[in-house]
UniProtKB/Swiss-Prot annotation:
SUPFAM superfamilies: Cyclotides. The keyword Methyltransferase does not apply. It comes from Viola biflora. Probably participates in a plant defense mechanism. The presence of a 'disulfide through disulfide knot' structurally defines this protein as a knottin. Disulfide bonds join 5-19, 9-21, 14-26. Keywords: Disulfide bond, Knottin, Plant defense. Pfam families: Cyclotide. This is Cyclotide vibi-C.
Amino acid sequence: GLPVCGETCAFGSCYTPGCSCSWPVCTRN
């Protein structure tokens, strides 16, 4: 998906609902 989740997952996980990690950023599923 598009990187619209506004957080990084380079050092952890995504916390925004409906988002997944596409290193190093979170992307909308």
